[in-house]
Amino acid sequence: MGSCPSSAGPGGCGTLVRGMASPDRVSQKDQARVRVSLEGTGESNISSGLPVLDHLLGLLARYGSLDLELQLAPDEPEAEVASAGRALGQALREPLSSDEVRGHGSAVAAADDALAHIVLEASGRPLVVSNVDLSEARTGGLGTDLVASFLHELAEGGGFTLHVRLIDGDDPQHVLEAIFKALGVALAQAGRPRKRRE
């Protein structure tokens, strides 16, 4: 990939997308390839092999105004979801831990009956604290327990402290959509330039 040019800005770079002024990060761990730009427009190109996960990551990108590309090698669903979370976290780890960005974000988002609150900090201490029971339900053929695995792998890969609170909602699909919308916004906030008083 070569060295990172000084023009890449505070987020650092994995590679630069041709024709884009903003830096992006690339991770190629666990046969997952992720490219993400924190200074995007919400465009996404996701091929995880799991339509529900594709949909949820598309919401994350759109609500966070992140440009996100993700390609996964075919595998068992459990491995695919874990790989996606870990690779995305690793791609975000360096830019969100930079002293030049806020490194933390908080957001509330709704999806029909569901309302979720996410607080994220690039603390270097991976931890997920959640009041959401994702142990048994299924949506679109995906066990929601795998989404819990995604969040844990995201936190581990990125070094994030992640608090997930479900304020309201019973429908599993809507609960997951609210969580991923709020997560996208919180990531966007974490990537904003740090103001002097912060």
Range-by-range predicted roles:
Residues 16-198:
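Polyanion-binding surfaces on beta-sheet-dominated domains and ring/shell assemblies
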